[in-house]
Amino acid sequence: EAAAANGSDHSAGLCRSQPVTQSTTVGLTIAYLVLFFAALLGNSIIIYVVQRHPKLRTTFNMLIVNMAASDILDVITAVPLSVAYLFVSVKWFPGGFGVFLCKLLPFLAYLSMGASVLTLTVMTIDRYFAIVRPMRRPLSKQLTMVAIILTWLISGAIFATELYKFRLFNDSGQVICAPRWVENIQDSHKITMFEKVIRFVLLYLVPLLTMAMFYSKIVLHLWKRKAPGVHIDKNQKRIEKQKRKVVTMLVTIVTLFAICWLPAHVNHFLLMFNLKVHSCLPHSLILTFYFLTHSNAAINPCLYLVFNESFREGFKHQVYNRLSRGNFNGSERLSTTRAEAFSATTSYNSLLSTKHGIRRDFGSAACRTML
């Protein structure tokens, strides 16, 4: 579509399309399989651990569970499409069920991406009020549920166009699944260019700038509290340390999200605005761009376990229970101290319990057309 939209004269200067090599196909297939099972297992563990332990069911962890759910949706929709593309390109199967999946799978893959970045934004704002403005009421569980539902509804509204534009075409006797807004290819390409820019701004640029602004304020606030001459008692030091670990985890997640999705956005813009340069990129490089975007789904649960002692301890106890075939007893429960330390950064009641101790300082992330 992009080549046709640029006209035959411009297309004459394009680099010749190179087929996917067998080594690239095998290598990426293995990588995608590892990614699929790692992301599915890791995010399922996060959801299970939170569900099993009442002390971990904080508003902040509800957002982490939402992130894990969106990552699972990403790998079960986008990974099969990406692997299929390695072997059959955009070929599809005919019939009503073929039309249904052609529209549904791209929509769900995009939906998960939008829900992830919006959830990250909500988590950032939640941490800002919990750390910088603790006297203001943070998100309640009811408001958190509303925020979670909104992340999916807003993402669904933004990407609802996938349900319209993806359709089946007959290309030289082969059925393919591809997006097209209108029958005229040039007009469809212009609409797609506008669409890519809007999505980049709404679901990449604006959220990242928003998160960068809030995290800058959080880091500045924590740095001031750590300055020499600022007296903090032992219990407050423990809570402050846990807050810093949570912020470090979130900043790492946001940074990796930005890094993982940037190459795909660059690829989209080259495809839309500079087809000549895009056509000269090695096919294996473009496919690697998209693998990088989905690898984010497997990295996130690792970060939760690395930075969060409560998650790690909950996971260890679950493994111990399975191996010993026993149920939790008093000695096997989560460490109350660690769980409360983490909850102190995410729970309104815990924030109120530290109110007097900080009174003097309280003002302060399948084919070129699909992905």
What are these regions (language model features)?
Residues 256-259, 266, 285-335:
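Seventh transmembrane helix
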Residues 179-189, 200, 220-264:
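Intracellular effector-coupling site of seven-transmembrane GPCRs
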Residues 25-33, 59-122, 133-137:
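Extracellular TM2-ECL1-early TM3 structural module of rhodopsin-like
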Residues 24-52:
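First transmembrane helix
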Residues 10-19, 88-106, 111, 144, ...:
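Loop architecture of class A 7-transmembrane GPCRs
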Residues 1-17, 171, 224-245, 309-371:
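Intrinsically disordered regulatory tails of 7TM GPCRs
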Residues 73, 84-87, 112-122, 129, ...:
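Fourth transmembrane helix
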Residues 73-83, 157-160, 164, 205, ...:
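Hydrophobic alpha-helical segments of membrane proteins
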